Amino acid sequence: MYSRHCNIPYQIRTSWMLTALAIVLIAPTPTLAADPRAQELERRTREQLELEQRLRLLERSGPLSPQAAPGPPPPLPVEPCWQVRGLRLQGNTLISLAQINARLQPLMSDCMSVTRINQLLTALTALYADAGFIASRPYLAQRPQDGQSLDVIIEEGFVESIELAAPDLPISLRGAFPGMLGKPLQLRELEQGLDQLNRLRSLDLTADVAPGSLPGGSRLLIRPRTSAAPIGAVVSYNNRGTEYIGRNNGALTLTYDSPLGLNDFVALSTSTTLDQTSAYSRSQSLYYNIPYGFWTLALSAGHSQYRYPVELPSQTVRANGQTRQYSLSLNRLLWRDQGTLLNGMLRLSSKRSQSYFADQYLAIQSPSLTVAEASLSLLKISDGLWNSTFSYAQGLDWLGADRDEERLSPALPRAQFRKYRADVSYWRQGRDGQWSWNSQLALQYSPDPLPSLEQMLLTDDYAVRGFRQDLVQAANGAVWRNTLSLPRRLGTQWTLSPRVGLDVGWSKQVTGAEGQRLAGANIGVGLSTRDWQLDLDYQRRLYGPPPSSHEPGFWRLELSLQI
């Protein structure tokens, strides 16, 4: 049964916190169909939320205490023994007889003493524990007798109840541990259930195991180590906007853990330019996910709009537009160990863009797309933090999307495109935290001319830095970012982080076209506490296309406050 109260039994596992950096992912963004930086913010917000939740799984459910490799068994004492005729097992359904024989055969002899029998039972218990069945136990069916087989019964056990020590927590044990009741206790399933709960910022839970009231039964107690408010907010300001839309930007993100009591999560984000002019860029997005065992279903919706004046020789006209995006994704945990998460994801997206210039509709810059995407994501902690995603996207003609056969020219962007993308990030910290290095590589390739919504943005704060006015995006491209930081503690709450960065990029619009190279540099400092962070950077372009303005370098300021 599922319950919400229990006495605290003995603890079966320990956890340790791994210091990890939430690496911001580089994502493909649109071009003239909408403000590219607004689209970048919407995509990046969703991917950052997903990454932070995956990081919490590893931080809050770290590895078991390391165990030394078993040495050679000590010499057996001289004691009475039984002349047994082989070993007979009963009750083994979870581990094959061949595996059991391979483990126990070296311990068998014609004369089995009490010490040797105990070694055999211990080895059998360890074999089940290594396979994740931590509540299984073997015992002798009867007293050994000369001339008889050694009879061993394996009680593989079952989960009798799953109980919550804090009944006021708004979580669902049934959704976190589906199908576990009545089945043998499997450590991987237990850890996965805890992972699904601990991915929420406000929860930090652990599990204890106690004997049940029925023979072979086990009671699981889920209890909190710490807890926080389920509602959170992040307010931020930055001046990384463009001159033609507005320099100053503000953003607000609200999060709510388990609003329906189903271990779900919802985030609402909005951003807007703050300059009081006729130009603006605004975006709003909604992200929701709900887990069930090893699966997670996610929904997202976003809307962005922009407007800015364009000065012509004889008059000033207005460019404006909007983009709507909706997506449904299904994520499956494929593999997990103490420092690795491997996830597979399928996503179906609908994207609609409308662009106008001087009140005239721009059909080519207003694609309607339906996109299916499959990806694999690997998050691994070893000597540093590795985060990589490999994806394939295919444009479809579903749900009212544009059709390739309706294009006026084969050279125009394809709605039924093919696109491959790889993102690899590595973060490493020096001894005693004296330095940290963050390296990010993003690659995108498509054999087709891509719509603006699917092109890769190469010049941005999260791509090649130093290009505030000049936007470069293409169907094919690569970006390699590197940042070296020297964090220093100031007292007990403050951290000062000087840093320097160097980025390079390469782009090619279509196969056969001439490539374009980019390079930019960054030097800055960050000051942070637990709840807020201030970043000040000087960015400068080193190499790239002819600039649209005479801005050789610029200062970037960003302030964020977590409530």
Label each PLM-derived region with a short phrase.
Residues A34-G241, S271-R282, L441:
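Periplasmic polypeptide-binding modules associated with outer-membrane biogenesis and secretion
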Residues L200, P215, E243-R247, T277-S281, ...:
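Transmembrane beta-barrel outer-membrane domains
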Residues L205, P230-A233, L260-V266, G293-L299, ...:
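Repeated loop/turn-to-beta-strand initiation elements of outer-membrane beta-barrel proteins
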Residues V209, V235-N239, V266-T272, L286, ...:
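Transmembrane beta-barrel strands of outer-membrane/channel proteins
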Residues L254, I523-W532, E551-I563:
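Outer-membrane beta-barrel "beta-signal"
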Residues Y256-S258, I290, R332-L334, L376-K380, ...:
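Residue-level signature of outer-membrane beta-barrel architecture
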Residues A267, T277-L378:
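Transmembrane beta-barrel wall of Gram-negative outer-membrane proteins
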Residues Q354-V504, K508-V510, P547-S549, L557-Q562:
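C-terminal outer-membrane beta-barrel translocator/porin domains of Gram-negative envelope proteins
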